[in-house]
Amino acid sequence: MKKNIKDIFKNFNIFWFCFIFLLLSLLYCLIMMEISHQHDNNKPSEIIAVLKEIKELQTKSTEESKKESKESKESKEDKTKIIKIKKFDIHETSNYGSYLIVFQWGTGNKDSFEWEKELKFPNVDQETYKEIMKICFEIIGTPIDKKDNITNLSQMITKIKEKTNLIPLQRIPYQPYFGFAPFISAVNICILIIIFYFIYNSIEKTSAQISGKNLNISRQKVLVNQQEFTFKDIAGADEEKEEMSELINFLKNPFKYEAMGARIPKGVLLYGPPGVGKTLLAKAVAGEAKVPFFAVSGSDFIEVYVGLGASRIRKLFNEAKQNAPCIIFIDEIETISHQRGSVNYSNSEHDQTLNQLLVEMDGFTKNIGVIVMAATNQPESLDLAVTRPGRFDRHFHITLPSVKDREAILKLHARNKKFNDDVDFESLAKQTPGFNGAQLEAILNESALLATRRNVLVICNEDISEALDRVLMGPSKKSKKYNDKEKRMVAYHESGHAVIGLKLPEADQIQKVTIIPRGNAGGYNLTLPQEETFFSSKKRLLAQITSFLGGRAAEEVVFQDVSNGAYSDFKYATEIAKKMVTQYGMSDLGPIQYMENNFYKNFSDSKAVEIDKEIQKIIDYCYQNAKKIITENRDLLDLISKYLLEIETITQKDLEEILNTGIIEWWEKDKLKKNLQKSEKEDCNK
């Protein structure tokens, strides 16, 4: 806001000029209006009277001149009296259909002549004008012939001169009154001036950017002294916090390390999947050390103008040196640090920006007290010169939170929310493997919104369960209704996944089965691994593929027909099988990696055929295994499908009851209670 006000005052000269120009235009219009009102004092009827008088004098003068000419034929002196209209002019004004008539007349002879009067009559209407023209014809004395070809006002005046003894007319300069037209024109001129001014100003700024003279540091968000955000505001990541404490100690006591001859790391690279808290961790380091924090994005330095990115890098580091000790945090650093010479990122602007970053981090100049932290999701794409020691010395892989960390994150985000006493964050943490911190926060926020929608003061387990489904699959499609055949097929499809999960030892545990449509899915199974591990065995991967194919196998076994509802299952199953063959070495092709991208692959076309055969072999094996398990456990499949058609959603506890007793106890009791109430009601009606 301050900057906008400053710009307004800076450019105030152009606005002052326009204001004065408009004021003068308005003043001119008002003055001309007053003059016009003064002219209006002469009534148009007066000119008619004057013209009639001219006509009479002309007639009388003509008769007298004839008489005198007879009496003084012998005299050569010409004493003929004539009537002279010195000035006679008619103008059509700016107002359509009105006229201005100006004339000056008098009588006399050639030796002596006295002027009588000069009159101006503005704004004469058409009716009066016609009457004046009629008298003018009479003054002429002869009618205007068609051969005279009079088509306009000026020709009329010329004929009056030709057919009378009037002295040649003298045109009177006249500035007509145009109303407020001059003011409107002035407004348009001012608008054009302002438009051209801003266009010129924009061109000037662009030229300054190209020349590197106008590099605004406002692109970089400088957050000074972030004491309010520290490690206490970050849950989990205990190992990363411990490693970062060394940087914090250096920022607080840099001379201690210099006295020992130790070189503090110049840069710290944080890499990992999205949403794990890389930016928050860097911000917390600055808050713990209580130093300025420069937060920028890699895209801030890339422009169409060559050299502008490098200039912004210099500007950023110069500003950081003035505020040392401090932290520069570059988010999405792969934007400016991709490997030079690669096909996708080979251009002079990218290379110049990267070279300038390399020089600033470890070049001829020293950046004492300036630590560079960067975050990326693609560490493999970074240029080797960036990741070498001396630039980014420390590399921290920020992984997805463990069960313990997820529980801590949930409790952290639950501090400002009210939950029911039966809400168990430990259980929720176990239900969310592979979730990052952002997703966990979204679950609790969504549950709070659902509770508010129900007009309750506390969040219960039902809200959290619904929020989890929303984050995973989207909101339920209540308007989407199945017919009986479709609903039965969806129930058996989801039951097929559940049977594989219950009967295959290496498969993931089933937490929930539902046939309520969400997003593009007609239903889904929520599964959890039996335990969180860093590695997956071949048996476990085959079990996952078998589980994905369980829905299609159930459709084929029960209906001898299949639907397109398994398209996403095939996608995930094929991805796992392809990785087993090309990356993990879990096929008959042996422990070899077959890598490919849009421009390169390290295997031949004949080998690609073999890879496809191996993938097909794995898929066929798992599908036959799924059909076998479904066929052997048809009774269990029918039971789960039956309850899905009735309840629509079955939990892990319900599945265990079906597996052990063949029924869901709470549902059977509820049905029995409803049947009794219905019977009692019918008896009362009888």
Swiss-Prot record:
Annotated ATP binding sites: 272-279
According to its UniProt record, this protein's enzyme class is: hydrolase
BP-aspect Gene Ontology terms: protein catabolic process; proteolysis
Subcellular location, in the record's words?
Cell membrane
Q: Which residues cross the membrane?
A: 12-32, 179-199
EC? 3.4.24.-
Taken from the record's topology, the Cytoplasmic segments are: 1-11, 200-686
Q: Which GO terms describe its molecular function?
A: ATP binding; ATP hydrolysis activity; ATP-dependent peptidase activity; metalloendopeptidase activity; zinc ion binding
Return the GO cellular component terms, semicolon-separated: plasma membrane
Extracellular topological domain residue ranges: 33-178
List the CDD domains: RecA-like_FtsH (cd19501)
Q: Does the keyword Cell membrane apply?
A: yes
Per the entry, the cofactor note is: Binds 1 zinc ion per subunit.
Its main subcellular localisation, reduced to a broad class, is: membrane
Q: Which cofactor does it need?
A: Zn(2+)
Q: Which residues form the active site?
A: 494
> How does the protein's chain sit in the membrane according to the entry?
Multi-pass membrane protein
Give the protein's function. Acts as a processive, ATP-dependent zinc metallopeptidase for both cytoplasmic and membrane proteins. Plays a role in the quality control of integral membrane proteins.
Tell me how this protein assembles: Homohexamer.
Q: Which family does it belong to?
A: In the central section; belongs to the AAA ATPase family.
> This chain belongs to which protein, by name?
ATP-dependent zinc metalloprotease FtsH 2
Q: What organism, scientifically named, is this protein from?
A: Phytoplasma mali (strain AT)
